[in-house]
Design a protein with these regions (language model features):
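Conserved alpha-helical scaffold segments that buttress catalytic/binding sites
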Residues: 43-389
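Long, low-complexity, intrinsically disordered N-terminal extensions of eukaryotic proteins, enriched
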Residues: 18, 41-43
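Short hydrophobic targeting helices and cationic amphipathic motifs
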Residues: 24, 33-38
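Polybasic, lysine-rich low-complexity intrinsically disordered segments
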Residues: 7-8, 21, 39
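Ala/Thr-enriched low-complexity intrinsically disordered regions
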Residues: 5, 25-30
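Repetitive helical segments and hydrophobic/amphipathic motifs
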Residues: 16-19, 29, 228
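Intrinsic-disorder-associated, low-complexity terminal segments enriched in Asp/Asn/His/Tyr and depleted
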Residues: 4, 10-12, 17, 32-34
Length: 389
């Protein structure tokens, strides 16, 4: 195909977009349709060329949408107060946004999905400052208890623990309020962390909107610890807290788990199948012995409920894809293995109701952010595809 032909096709496509915009505007005005339909009429894409380099002055992926126009809103949560090893994830959203302009605006599973609008909110500076301050306090506390010192013998450490736990309560309410507000406006919502403690308020807002649902957790860790290191809402406790506080979270299905404690294993065994865990070692053994990934994913999908939220901790991947992750563990998935599973979930007729992407860390280069941006792109396209207007 020659250059002139491609230009003509692109021009025809933009003319088509203008016609669609005018048509939906007329229909919406005439029939007083729900505001969600205005998503398709508020952004004029006739001057946007998805085939050229991404414009860093635009929003995520170089897309030209505003929050009002976009159907899917990504909420950044810059929080890493309780991380117990490497830090850097509080600033992941900024780095992922920069890296995202390198992605081609096309998804083979949903070629037109981006036209519904993806928008990343600006990072809340107050929340980031709060995270930075409490992180310094938490580091002192973690160092203190790691040496076998007793917290009850030190008034300063008792106050530090109290401050961190109060900060986590503040975070949970902040996330819940933000997500609930967006859902009430008819938006699809995703969360971009930040550490894995961040989505509890998100889960609670989803539970109110969708009633019974399940979480598919991609992770190297179970995150089923109770009061880890004394922190009520540690990144290592997110799924424990979700199960304790959200009654209509019916199923937690974990895959890729390869670093866990005996107490967490006991919680799984005593959960009456509310927690279903596919350990990384067991998956690998089944593959080594001749089973296919198709067979394993068929089984996984069949055990999920109708409504599914994906909680994606980046350390669920092979560490070569996320070398700066806060708690890296050898093993893990290739990205395409997970994309295959996610696509199969949608093809089964199940509904993806949301997702979070967490623990992407900032390194010396932008490799982690690049990988994170590509995972985010795929998840955004899957979410809008699973929720047609």
């Amino acid at each position: 195909m020659g250059v002139d032909t491609r230009k003509k096709l692109n021009s025809n496509s933009r003319v088509g977009d203008i016609i669609k915009i005018k048509f939906f505007a007329a229909i919406t005005k005439a029939f007083n349709l729900h505001p969600v339909f205005q998503i398709f009429i508020m952004t004029d894409l006739s001057q946007f060329d998805p085939d050229i380099a991404g414009n860093p002055n635009n929003n995520i992926f170089g897309l030209p949408f505003s929050e009002e126009d976009a159907r899917l809103i990504i909420l950044p949560v810059p929080w890493e107060v309780t991380v117990s090893y490497g830090a850097g994830t509080a600033r992941a959203a900024e780095q992922i946004r920069k890296a995202s302009t390198q992605i081609d605006i096309f998804d083979s599973e949903n070629p037109e999905g981006w036209k519904e609008g993806f928008y990343l909110r600006d990072v809340d500076k107050k929340l980031l400052m709060k995270s930075d301050y409490l992180r310094k306090e938490a580091e002192l506390y973690i160092d203190y208890i790691s040496k076998g010192q007793k917290v009850e013998d030190n008034q300063f450490m008792l106050k530090t623990l109290k401050d961190v736990n109060e900060g986590s309560n503040y975070l949970n309410k902040w996330v819940y309020d933000q997500i609930k507000g967006l859902l009430s406006r008819g938006k699809l919502v995703a969360l971009l962390g930040g550490d894995h403690s961040t989505p509890l308020g998100y889960f609670k807002a989803l539970a109110e909107k969708y009633q019974d649902f399940g979480i598919l957790q991609i992770d190297a860790h179970c995150d089923l610890r109770s009061d880890y290191s004394g922190f009520s809402y540690s990144h290592a406790s997110i799924m424990y807290n979700a199960l304790q506080e959200i009654e209509n979270l019916k199923t937690l299905l974990q895959i890729g788990i390869r670093d866990y404690s005996g107490s967490e294993l006991e919680i799984i065994h005593n959960s009456n199948d509310r927690i279903i865990t596919y350990f990384d070692k067991d998956i690998k053994c089944r593959l080594f012995e001749g089973q296919t990934w198709k067979q394993i994913t068929d089984e996984i999908v069949n055990r999920l409920p109708q409504k599914v939220h994906i909680s994606f901790d980046i350390d669920g991947l092979d560490p070569k894809l996320c070398p700066n992750a806060g708690t890296p563990v050898h093993g893990g998935f290739e990205i395409e293995e997970l994309f295959y599973l996610f696509t199969k979930i949608l093809r089964s007729g199940r509904q993806l109701i949301g997702f979070d992407l967490l623990e992407v860390a900032v390194g010396e280069n932008n490799w982690d952010a690049n990988v994170g941006a590509r995972v985010l792109w795929k998840l955004c396209n899957l979410l809008v595809k699973s929720n047609p207007v």
